[in-house]
Each structure stands twice: as C-alpha cells, then as structure tokens.
Regions:
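N-terminal subdomain of nucleotide-sugar transferases
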Residues: 1-56, 79-81
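Active-site donor-binding segments of glycosyltransferases and PAPS-dependent sulfotransferases
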Residues: 27, 46-96
Length: 162
C-alpha cells in the first residue's frame, strides 16, 4: 500500500495502471472495507494490477492537508490511468472535483453519503451528489439497492454502472 514518503517512488506514469483510493484503514473489520479487500483479492486472482492508496481517516471531511496530499498523489498518476475512488473519499473531494474529473475516475459507491446524515448536512451531500454523480463516467456499486438509487434518484445511466 502507498503511504506518505513511499508514494513518490512507487507511483508510475503507466496509463495501464489502476489505482484504488480509499480513506482509512482497509484492515478495519467493517462491511465497506471488507468489500474493498474483496475487490483487491479479485483483482489479484485475475492478475489485474491494482495499486491501493490509503488516504486519511478524516474523509468525508478532509482537512486542507488531506486535500493537498491527494493532489500530490494525482500529480504522480498518468491522467489516462483508471482511478477507483471510494465514495467516502470522493464525496469529501468536491472542492477539487474539476481536477479529479480530468482523470479516468470510477466511483465505488456503497450508498450515497446523504443517507448517513440528517438535516443540513444530508441536504448538502444530496445536492453535491446530484450535481457531481452525473459527471462521473463509471460506477461500481455494492448492492442492487444502491444501483437502483443511482439510476432512479440520481439519473445515472445503467451503462455507467459496472
């Protein structure tokens, strides 16, 4: 996994690389991380090289330092590479969304983040998700419910969900 000072040496400009960006500790015993570990295991079995990149646990509420760190990562990745970004991280990156969309982004959505909150915070995430999900080219979803929610509530085209 890529952390801090090791990142500079290990990222390449190879456009065939696939990067997997997620917040926090992938070894935590939660459903989300178990799903993400399954993606990495599946890729390994299929001999697909996915390069995991762990971000801060602060997402979806990253600090300025967290955002700067991620921007440094992006600068070291070929823009034609595929970057799978976990929704928890992606939905905390709206301040740099235009930059992110210059890359080949695949959003991994467990469920829209607005569902985790109430009141103004929920409304804010719902607005941002509706605005930004339509700009993403591909999605990976973790359930039929999430797939249906993206199609029906966010108007994501079925062919964008892989």
């Amino acid at each position: 996994m890529l952390h801090g000072h090791h990142m500079k040496k290990r990222l390449s400009k190879n456009k065939s690389d696939i990067y997997f960006v997620y917040p926090g500790n992938i070894n935590a015993k939660t459903g989300g991380y178990i799903y993400e570990k399954n993606i990495l295991e599946y890729a390994k079995i299929r001999d697909i090289n996915i390069r995991p990149i762990a971000l801060s646990e602060n997402y979806p509420f990253p600090t300025n330092k967290d955002i700067k760190y991620f921007l440094k990562i992006l600068d070291k990745i070929d823009p034609h590479s595929k970057i799978i970004i976990d929704g928890l991280a992606l939905e905390g990156m709206y301040s740099i969304f235009k930059k992110i969309l210059t890359y080949n982004v695949i959003a991994l959505i467990h469920h829209p983040l607005y569902l985790e909150f109430k009141g103004q915070r929920s409304k804010k995430f719902l607005r941002l998700e509706k605005e930004n999900f339509k700009k993403i080219n591909k999605f990976i979803v973790t359930s039929k419910n999430t797939k249906n929610l993206l199609i029906n509530e966010f108007k994501v085209l079925k062919n964008k969900i892989i």
